[in-house]
């Protein structure tokens, strides 16, 4: 591989903020459309100890000759007290602890204090417990507040009786020192009063913005680092650097959002606010790089393909792992994680990332595929076989050879590039060697599952139409079955009624026949009896005196 001048390498490292990668073959991967968009360091963090910051909300003015009456300061004091009164009352309600010496009743007092929270999450209850604990150390806090009340220094470290270091921050005093103190003896009191009033009004606006959510319940809503930045003003970097005792970039830590603050108590007498800042413990993994990869489509025999690589990998000790960083905090130059999320990658992908391009796996792309270009480090990477690449300055059309996977366009080739309807201003020079001995014609194209959006949509539409037809047929047959079932039920009922009718009629006929037979027998007997009575000699003659013929 072509070696770069040491000065160029130094400038490149300073520009990106990271060291060049060895395990991953970045130059070779450019041939197949894999671009390293960002390289970050890997940081681990865990919950650390808490630091306390005392914010002095009222500035100290230098002594005057007695002729100046700064009315704006009194108005600011009244307005600030009105603003903080809901916070003070809420904190007092939550931190109320029963005055007793027994352990059981002390615990019950904390429970009573927490009962003011209502329905709260575990994190909110933890925050409230922190306020209760801070209230138990109220004497030390008051001593700390008193010790910084008379100072004009914007940042001063004070050690209380328990040797707990806290930082006294006077954000507004920092502004007063810069704008007021140096000229208060040489200008009129009215002008300074107006200037002080404008500064105080601006700070009140910022305070209202910061504590907008905390007015309802400050213990349950932590202050973000953005709110702390507004609250502490220009003193925040000094506070953070004094607390962390680390070489990490302060802006990087602030952008992570891992530093949070919580209001612990407010002193109405001194207008001072005690804020607990939760500072995690950070550890950097030496030699580890988290690399973001962008895979754009490449050209293979006039067919559009895309290589199968992870979106983010971890390079450590000359090894490569998949590193999604789903549970991590990603900043411009670092990845903050609680644990290592690395996982093994297939051997073919490993060899591909190491520069063995014949081991790379490609998937054909059919239809529209939006990832045809990428803009990284001031250089444009594009598949100009599937995309119209036009240079506006100097005007020409960028052509791409059939054996090349992508085109790399830097400021030497074009300063303003047009990709279809997109316009890009190219600002950097491509300072790596573009390997041209690999031909996409010999690439290992594996037809995994082609990403054919148009065909897939058509297939889905056909499936939906077929499903609708089947549903219509199903409804028709269901209606038919429902009608047939009704007819069958009616026929069965009619048949049963007919059978019952026939049985009843048969029984009636049998009964009538039996009744008629009995009537005939009765009539025959009655006629015989009547004849005997009328002709007794006949029966006596024929039956020898037995009128019934009985011997």
Curated annotation (Swiss-Prot):
Main function: Class I viral fusion protein. Under the current model, the protein has at least 3 conformational states: pre-fusion native state, pre-hairpin intermediate state, and post-fusion hairpin state. During viral and plasma cell membrane fusion, the heptad repeat (HR) regions assume a trimer-of-hairpins structure, positioning the fusion peptide in close proximity to the C-terminal region of the ectodomain. The formation of this structure appears to drive apposition and subsequent fusion of viral and plasma cell membranes.
Protein's name in the database: Fusion glycoprotein F0
GO biological process: fusion of virus membrane with host plasma membrane; symbiont entry into host cell
Membrane topology of the entry: Single-pass type I membrane protein; Single-pass membrane protein
Positions bearing the site annotation: Cleavage: 106-107
Signal peptide: 1-23
Keyword entries, A-Z: Cleavage on pair of basic residues, Coiled coil, Disulfide bond, Fusion of virus membrane with host cell membrane, Fusion of virus membrane with host membrane, Glycoprotein, Host cell membrane, Host membrane, Membrane, Signal, Transmembrane, Transmembrane helix, Viral envelope protein, Viral penetration into host cytoplasm, Virion, Virus entry into host cell
One Pfam family cited in the UniProt record for this chain: Fusion_gly
Subcellular localization(s) per the UniProt record: Virion membrane; Host cell membrane
């Amino acid at each position: 591989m072509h070696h770069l001048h040491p000065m160029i390498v130094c400038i490149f490292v300073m520009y990106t903020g990271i060291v060049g990668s060895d395990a991953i073959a970045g130059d070779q991967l450019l041939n197949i459309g894999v671009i390293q968009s960002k390289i970050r360091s890997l940081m681990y963090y865990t919950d650390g100890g808490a630091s306390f910051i005392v914010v002095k909300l009222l500035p100290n003015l230098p002594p005057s000759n007695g002729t100046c009456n700064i009315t704006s300061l009194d108005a600011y004091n009244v307005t600030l007290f009105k603003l903080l009164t809901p916070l003070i009352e809420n904190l007092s309600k939550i931190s109320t602890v029963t005055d007793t010496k027994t352990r059981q009743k002390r615990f019950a007092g904390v429970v009573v204090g927490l009962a003011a929270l209502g329905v709260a999450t575990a994190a909110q209850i933890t925050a409230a417990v922190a306020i209760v604990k801070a209230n138990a150390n109220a004497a030390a806090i008051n001593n700390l507040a008193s010790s910084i009340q008379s100072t004009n220094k914007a940042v001063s470290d004070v050690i209380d009786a328990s040797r707990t270091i806290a930082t006294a921050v006077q954000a507004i005093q920092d502004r007063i020192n810069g704008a007021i103190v140096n000229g208060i003896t040489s200008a009129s009191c009215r002008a300074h009063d107006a200037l002080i009033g404008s500064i105080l009004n601006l700070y009140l606006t910022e305070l209202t913005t910061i504590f907008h959510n905390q007015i309802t319940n400050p213990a349950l809503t932590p202050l973000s680092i953005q709110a702390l930045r507004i609250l502490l003003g220009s003193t925040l970097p000094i506070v953070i650097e004094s607390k962390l005792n680390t070489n990490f970039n302060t802006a990087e830590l602030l952008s992570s959002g891992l530093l949070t603050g919580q209001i612990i108590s407010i002193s109405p007498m001194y207008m001072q606010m005690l804020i607990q800042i939760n500072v995690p413990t950070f550890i950097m993994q030496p030699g580890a790089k988290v690399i973001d990869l962008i895979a754009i489509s490449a050209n293979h025999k006039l067919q559009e393909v895309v290589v199968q690589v992870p979106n983010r990998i971890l390079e450590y000790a000359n090894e490569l792992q998949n590193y999604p960083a789903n549970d991590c905090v990603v900043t411009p130059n670092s990845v903050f994680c609680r644990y290592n999320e690395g996982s093994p990658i297939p051997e073919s992908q490993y060899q591909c990332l190491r520069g063995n391009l014949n081991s790379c796996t490609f998937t054909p792309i059919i239809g529209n595929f939006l990832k045809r270009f990428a803009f990284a480090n001031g250089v444009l990477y594009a598949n100009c076989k599937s995309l119209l690449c036009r240079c506006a300055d100097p005007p020409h059309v960028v052509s791409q050879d059939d054996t090349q996977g992508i085109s790399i366009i830097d400021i030497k080739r074009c300063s303003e590039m047009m990709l279809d309807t997109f316009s890009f201003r190219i600002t950097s020079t491509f300072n790596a060697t573009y390997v041209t001995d690999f031909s996409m014609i010999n690439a290992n194209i594996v037809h995994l599952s082609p990403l054919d959006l148009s065909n897939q949509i058509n297939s889905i539409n056909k499936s939906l139409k077929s499903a609708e037809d089947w549903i219509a047929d199903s409804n028709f047959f269901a209606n038919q079955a429902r009608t047939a079932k009704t007819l069958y039920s009616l026929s069965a009922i009619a048949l049963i009624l007919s059978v019952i009718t026939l049985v009843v009629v048969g029984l009636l006929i049998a009964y009538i026949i039996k009744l008629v037979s009995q009537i005939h027998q009765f009539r025959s007997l009655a006629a015989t009896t009547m004849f005997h009575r009328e002709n007794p000699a006949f029966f006596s003659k024929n039956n020898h005196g037995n009128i019934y013929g009985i011997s």
